[in-house]
């Protein structure tokens, strides 16, 4: 176990770190509470397809996995500022000892990215094979979730493959300097994926609108297309929100990591924690899901009322025509 340098000790005890730790504690609790509320609503009977529901619950799992792993950093800040009696030595952590925590952290980040890909594929299946998709219920979601879970679990194993972890760091939420090249590659892949998710979902929305216009007189097909369009739009809004947070993370952190040598250590660590955006993506996920469910329910009620109103007008017109014919 090594001791922190003078600058690192200053970072540990700075007001900025204490404020950030308190802020992250609020985000951590908000993520857990929001996720429980979102899961409760998703478990109710909603217009969201079962397959999509499984993937949304999976996204909440990855968000909470990330937050539990990342919360080790605020805990250490509180511990060193409140309970540490030996101010001459602020202990650093071996990157090897951090492997379990960093593995969960990387799983949360990559899982949140890959689950967006799974949601896009799920919407694509619902668009191309609407009848088969509705009959399979939750099966596509479970298959896609497993396909996401496996690579997400091994993300950090791939990043640290063939690299010796023999250095020390302040927090387990910081990745070893020995894997900086692969970590930068990982961030670049995240950037490309976020852009791809937005493009794919926008194309699916356009495709569903075109299908809806073509099948104007096919009631069953039009209903499935309309429901798919609403769900895809909701998923697209989720993807855009996640995109903004992850783009800030992947772009901002990547920029700072590549210019780390030109940035003073104290400034670097006090700034990069705010650029690290996955906690913002995690805490925003549950409210966005709750809002999407509320919006879908509202749109469906409006659609039902408009149909009922149209039917009533048609019946009245028909009766008037009969009355005129009897005269």
Swiss-Prot record:
Residues 40-53, 120-138, 207-234, 292-327 are cytoplasmic. Residues 1-18, 75-98, 160-185, 256-270 are extracellular. GO terms for molecular function: G protein-coupled receptor activity; olfactory receptor activity. This is Serpentine receptor class alpha-12. The lineage of its organism: Eukaryota, Metazoa, Ecdysozoa, Nematoda, Chromadorea. Belongs to the nematode receptor-like protein sra family. The gene is sra-12. One of its GO terms (cellular component) is membrane. It comes from Caenorhabditis elegans. Its main location: membrane.
């Amino acid at each position: 176990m090594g001791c922190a340098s003078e600058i690192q000790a200053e970072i540990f005890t700075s007001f900025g770190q204490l404020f950030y730790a308190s802020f992250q504690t609020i985000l951590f609790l908000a993520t857990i509470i929001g996720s429980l509320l979102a899961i409760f609503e998703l478990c109710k009977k909603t217009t969201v397809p079962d397959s999509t529901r499984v993937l949304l619950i999976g996204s909440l799992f990855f968000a909470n996995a990330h937050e539990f792993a990342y919360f080790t950093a605020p805990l250490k800040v509180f511990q060193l500022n409140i309970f540490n009696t030996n101010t001459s030595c602020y202990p650093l952590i071996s990157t090897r000892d951090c492997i379990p925590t960093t593995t969960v952290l990387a799983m949360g980040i990559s899982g949140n990215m890959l689950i967006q890909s799974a949601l896009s594929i799920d919407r694509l299946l619902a668009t191309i094979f609407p009848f088969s998709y509705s009959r399979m219920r939750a099966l596509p979601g479970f298959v896609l979730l497993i396909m996401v879970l496996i690579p997400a679990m091994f993300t950090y194993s791939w990043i640290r493959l063939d690299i010796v972890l023999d250095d020390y760091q302040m927090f387990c939420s910081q990745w070893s300097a020995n894997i900086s090249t692969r970590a930068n590659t990982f961030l670049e892949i995240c950037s490309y994926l976020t852009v791809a998710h937005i493009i794919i979902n926008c194309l699916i929305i356009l495709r569903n609108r075109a299908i809806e216009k073509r099948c104007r007189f096919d009631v069953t097909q039009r209903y499935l297309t309309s429901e798919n369009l609403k769900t895809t739009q909701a998923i697209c809004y989720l993807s855009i929100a996640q995109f903004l947070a992850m783009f800030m993370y992947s772009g901002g952190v990547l920029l700072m990591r590549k210019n780390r040598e030109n940035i003073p250590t104290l400034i670097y660590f006090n700034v990069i924690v705010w650029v690290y955006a996955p906690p913002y993506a995690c805490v925003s996920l549950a409210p966005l899901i709750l809002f999407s469910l509320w919006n879908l329910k509202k749109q469906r009620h409006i659609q039902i009322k408009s149909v009922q109103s149209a039917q009533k007008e048609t019946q009245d017109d028909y009766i008037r025509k009969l009355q005129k014919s009897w005269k």
